[in-house]
Amino acid sequence: MVRDIGIDLGTANILVFLKDRGIILNEPSLVALDERNGDVIAVGERAYQMVGRTPKEINVHHPLKGGVIADIAVTEQLLELFMQKLNLNSWFSKPDILICTPTNITTVEQKAIIQAAIKCGGRNIYLEEEPKVAAVGVGLDIFSPIGNMVIDIG
């Protein structure tokens, strides 16, 4: 069964939305890595709990800065592990993924996001600007000739 997935790659948190179930994941955008070999020790909430409590060879990374990917390899690992955790990939059906992006990202950053989503198992990847997705999410008709204001405060 193919599922439609929405992902908000936030600097602080990652949210994953399924069309039929709503928000199914809301965890910190963090990855704990063993710097000696590059192994992922923990992601999300488990990585957050490790902040300031790890030996020097284990560091907690923030792979997203200002809403965009700062470290593509770590972001790919983060997305891949969350997809495995949620069991949203299968050999036979790859999900369509809509990813919210800031309005001011560059084409290089867009390509990095698409690359990360494809590597974690996405079939068709769509990027939409966060304000547009927020407006649709609260039920605004974005195609009507009536003006609306969407304010994103974090």
Predicted regions and their residues:
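Nucleotide/phosphate-binding catalytic cleft detector across ATP-hydrolyzing
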Residues: M1-I153
